């Protein structure tokens, strides 16, 4: 606290005029004093201005068609999932803005509840990438969590609050901004309970985690340890309201298709029922017909399913889609590796047959789009090792044989530069 001057006069705040006896603190500057009350007032004004600047106006919120169009630039296929996500995300942020307007006008209109999203589908089909691209477009904090690392409170492993800590960190510890972010929880199928019937023994990494996630999915005031985990019991907790946090929960749900198939197959019993061949049933998109009862049978608890009302399914990518993924999106792998070779002054070319062969290998390995980069790395490794040490290479051509038979890519040598002619008249 500032002290009494040499003349015995009390020091005063240069802004509000209060003496040092009327305030808790008086901070001195070069010929200026400011009290704690004026500092608090300044902070409030700054926070209000920042909040107004960060708030997305309703007319600026991209429409579902615009969201889908943006996703088309980065994600190939999965049209149904794109439409579902576009509508769900648009409605979510429209709901947030409606809540802010009702608070400002002090009216009590119809309360809009949150609709979290459940994404189903095989690995490597774009579930995570769709969520990442959405967050990028909306410019909101985005965090990815792995459900397999979570355990119920009191057991070895991560608490569910650690998911919220990742979101707060993604927002640079701006809690207000984090409260309108997106959290993507992957591998949620791995926390399904081990049997349909409730177990006598405690399932701390399955049903226990589902129970722990219920509150934050629905919306609650959560206490988050800023240093994470349970190793710092005396740390101050960060308070965050999850009411406006959008949760996208995803998993491969291997085996769910059989549960759906068994249920759908029962329709084919009795006179007049439609009878389908085994091949027709196998090729059917089972994930598109998933019902809550199927997810319960798989191992998700009814309360958990009830907090995920929007279901978006992704399908296996066919060969044509994989070839497009390699070359068409803005961040396509072919464009990425072409840029890497350009940095060494070398042109890179893939023949159409080579791209087909890469897609075939990804399908054979069962890794979907996620496996494309691994195949590209294997194919290009020998030339990526040699090219930086050579200055005689103009172009590298990757062919079908390069991919299928491990033949080295075709190397086109650089034409030697002609020596300059001397002018005889000189």
From Swiss-Prot:
Domain ClpX-type ZB, residue spans: 1-54
Gene Ontology MF: a single term: zinc ion binding
Entry GO terms, CC: HslUV protease complex
GO biological process: cell division; proteolysis involved in protein catabolic process
UniProt xrefs under PROSITE patterns: CLPX_ZB
Keywords: ATP-binding, Chaperone, Metal-binding, Nucleotide-binding, Zinc
Matching InterPro entries: AAA+_ATPase, ATP-dep_Clp_protease_ClpX, ATPase_AAA_core, Clp_ATPase_C, Clp_protease_ATP-bd_su_ClpX, ClpX_bact, P-loop_NTPase, Znf_CppX_C4
Entry superkingdom: Bacteria
Binding positions for ATP per the UniProt entry: 122-129
The keyword Metal-binding is assigned to this record: yes
Keyword Lipid metabolism: no
List of residues binding Zn(2+): 13, 16, 35, 38
Family statement: Belongs to the ClpX chaperone family.
Purpose of the protein: ATP-dependent specificity component of the Clp protease. It directs the protease to specific substrates. Can perform chaperone functions in the absence of ClpP.
Assembly, per entry: Component of the ClpX-ClpP complex. Forms a hexameric ring that, in the presence of ATP, binds to fourteen ClpP subunits assembled into a disk-like structure with a central cavity, resembling the structure of eukaryotic proteasomes.
Name under which the protein is recorded: ATP-dependent Clp protease ATP-binding subunit ClpX
Natural source organism: Mycobacterium sp. (strain KMS)
Lineage start: Bacteria, Bacillati, Actinomycetota, Actinomycetes, Mycobacteriales
Gene: clpX
């Amino acid at each position: 606290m500032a002290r009494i001057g040499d003349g015995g006069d009390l020091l005063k705040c240069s802004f509000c005029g209060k003496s040092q006896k009327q305030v808790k603190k008086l901070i001195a500057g070069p010929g200026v004093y400011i009290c704690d009350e004026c500092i608090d007032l300044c902070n409030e004004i700054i926070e209000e201005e920042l909040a107004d600047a960060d708030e997305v106006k309703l007319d600026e919120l991209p429409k579902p068609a615009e969201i889908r169009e943006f996703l088309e630039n980065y994600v190939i296929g999965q049209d149904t999932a794109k439409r579902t996500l576009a509508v769900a995300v648009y409605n979510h942020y429209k709901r947030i803005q409606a809540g802010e307007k009702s608070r400002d006008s002090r009216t009590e209109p119809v309360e809009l509840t949150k609709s979290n999203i459940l994404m189903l589908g095989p690995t490597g089909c774009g579930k995570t990438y769709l969520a990442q691209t959405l967050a990028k477009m909306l410019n909101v904090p985005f965090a990815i969590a792995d459900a397999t690392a979570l355990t119920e409170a009191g057991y070895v492993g991560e608490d569910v609050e650690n998911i919220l800590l990742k979101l707060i960190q993604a927002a640079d510890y701006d809690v207000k901004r984090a409260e309108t972010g997106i959290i993507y929880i992957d591998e949620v199928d791995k926390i399904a309970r081990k049997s349909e019937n409730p177990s006598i023994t405690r399932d701390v990494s399955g049903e226990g985690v589902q129970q722990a996630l219920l509150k934050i999915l629905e919306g609650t005031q959560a206490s988050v340890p800023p240093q994470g985990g349970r190793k710092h019991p005396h740390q101050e907790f960060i308070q965050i309201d999850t009411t406006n946090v959008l949760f996208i929960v995803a998993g491969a749900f291997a085996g769910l298709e059989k549960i759906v198939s068994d249920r759908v197959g029962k329709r084919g019993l009795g006179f007049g029922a439609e009878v389908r061949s085994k091949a027709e049933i196998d090729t059917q998109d089972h994930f598109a017909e998933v019902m809550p009862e199927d997810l319960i049978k798989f191992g998700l608890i009814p309360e958990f399913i009830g907090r995920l009302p929007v279901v978006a399914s992704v399908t296996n990518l066919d060969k044509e889609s994989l070839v497009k993924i390699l070359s068409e999106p803005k961040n396509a792998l072919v464009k990425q590796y072409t840029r890497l070779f350009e940095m060494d002054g070398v042109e890179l070319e893939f023949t159409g047959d080579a791209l087909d062969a890469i897609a075939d290998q990804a399908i054979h390995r069962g890794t979907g789009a996620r496996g494309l980069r691994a195949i590209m790395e294997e194919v290009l490794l020998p030339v990526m090792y040699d090219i930086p040490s050579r200055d005689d290479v103009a172009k590298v051509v990757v062919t079908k044989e390069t991919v299928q038979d491990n033949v080295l890519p075709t190397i086109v040598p650089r034409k030697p530069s002609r020596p300059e002619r001397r002018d005889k008249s000189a």
